[in-house]
Amino acid sequence: MRLCDKDIEQYLDDEKIIIEPKPDSSMISGVSVDIRLGNEFRVFQDHTAPYIDLSAPKGEVQEAMNSIMSDEIFIADGDAFFLHPGELALAVTYESVTLPDNIVGWLDGRSSLARLGLMVHVTAHRIDPGWSGQIVLEFYNSGKLPLALRPKMKIAALNFETMSSSAARPYNKREDAKYRDQKGAVASRISQDEKVNK
């Protein structure tokens, strides 16, 4: 069951859901909380790699990732990050979110931004029960013009769904949780995935 605005406010007041800094009531709508853009970004650099073999040995995957991903880029408040048409970039939410073991979060883009071609997540919009940290955004500009994105602008909406019971394996207790307590525009850690050989 999705939480309505009254429930979201109560869960925030009771600290069952923690969003830092805590949103004021103007950021809470009927079923969601507005989330703002943070200051950290990463882009894919010019490179000569013909491809990344995602099933290669971990070291090779990490080496390929290091060759294409930029260091973290900090954009000061008031300045803009420009996302060009056809470009993929990573960013991070201004807010940090902590969920209990019995709530899953869903991050959705804003319709007004989507109508300009901005996707705020490529496929990863689920926030697992037990999550704690900032949320990395996978930006893609499918429009025709560059988009100027500024820290602290409203960038997405987060809504919450109660589960039938608490998760037996919440994110914060999993040994394979690669993004636990995430801060900043963390690049893919796919090289840490366990290889499954069948």
Curated annotation (Swiss-Prot):
Belongs to the dCTP deaminase family. InterPro entries: dCTP_deaminase (IPR011962), dUTPase-like_sf (IPR036157), dUTPase_trimeric (IPR033704). DCTP binds at R110, S111, S112, L113, A114, R115, D128, V136, L137, E138, Y171, K178, Q182. The lineage of its organism: Bacteria, Pseudomonadati, Pseudomonadota, Gammaproteobacteria, Alteromonadales. One of its GO terms (molecular function) is nucleotide binding. This is dCTP deaminase. NCBIfam families: dCTP_deam (TIGR02274). Pfam families: DCD (PF22769). The keyword Hydrolase applies. Homotrimer. The keyword Nucleotide-binding applies. Residues 172-183 have a biased composition (Basic and acidic residues). It comes from the Bacteria. PANTHER family: DCTP DEAMINASE (PTHR42680:SF3). Its EC number is 3.5.4.13. One of its GO terms (biological process) is dUTP biosynthetic process. Keywords: Hydrolase, Nucleotide metabolism, Nucleotide-binding. Pathway: Pyrimidine metabolism; dUMP biosynthesis; dUMP from dCTP (dUTP route): step 1/2.
